[in-house]
Amino acid sequence: MVSVTELLDDPAINAYILRMIGEEGIELLRRFPEGGEHSDEELAEMTGVNLNTVRHTLYTLYERRLAEYRRLKNTETGWLTYLWHLRLDRVHDVLEEQVRDALEHLDARLAYEEKNDFYMCRNCSVVYTFTDAANWNFECPNCEEMLEHFDNELIAVALRKRIDRIKESLGSA
């Protein structure tokens, strides 16, 4: 298994995790004890990272399946303790899943751009589909200026390029 340090040395993974949990979260990961399970309070004490930051980071990682917990109930007090451990071995799968989701959204956007004809109000800089423009008699509903045809070919070309690059990076081009 790859260490946290090795993962964070990868610029793409570091950027992804940084965007997800911020600098303080990265600091928690760097100081996270290897092996075993730890409560959020223990982690805050062991790492010197603020308890709220520890909790926020762990929950964010949990939402992405990059951390897991085991819940223990104190039979005397009824209090629950969550013991956490990292699952950063999944980061590549999580990243790939998110890239595939982004690809799906880009494909849908490209289909929308190719399927529709667009009209724009030069005054308001708002773009409308043909259907909406026709419903408003090709007048802007905001300022009543005439709508002009909008050529979206540059958008479609940019989307195709982006889709091709993503597919190539996923090895499915």
UniProtKB/Swiss-Prot annotation:
One Gene Ontology MF term: DNA binding
Sorted UniProt keywords: DNA-binding, Transcription, Transcription regulation
InterPro entries linked: TF_E_archaea, TFE, TFIIE/TFIIEa_HTH, TFIIE_asu, TFIIEa/SarR/Rpc3_HTH_dom, WH-like_DNA-bd_sf, WH_DNA-bd_sf
GO BP term, pick one: regulation of DNA-templated transcription
Gene3D superfamilies: Winged helix-like DNA-binding domain superfamily/Winged helix DNA-binding domain
Source organism superkingdom: Archaea
SMART domains: TFIIE
Domain HTH TFE/IIEalpha-type: 9-92
Function: Transcription factor that plays a role in the activation of archaeal genes transcribed by RNA polymerase. Facilitates transcription initiation by enhancing TATA-box recognition by TATA-box-binding protein (Tbp), and transcription factor B (Tfb) and RNA polymerase recruitment. Not absolutely required for transcription in vitro, but particularly important in cases where Tbp or Tfb function is not optimal. It dynamically alters the nucleic acid-binding properties of RNA polymerases by stabilizing the initiation complex and destabilizing elongation complexes.
Protein family (similarity comment): Belongs to the TFE family.
Domain writeup: The winged helix domain is involved in binding to DNA in the preinitiation complex.
The protein's assembly and partners: Monomer. Interaction with RNA polymerase subunits RpoF and RpoE is necessary for Tfe stimulatory transcription activity. Able to interact with Tbp and RNA polymerase in the absence of DNA promoter. Interacts both with the preinitiation and elongation complexes.
Protein name per UniProt: Transcription factor E
Gene: tfe
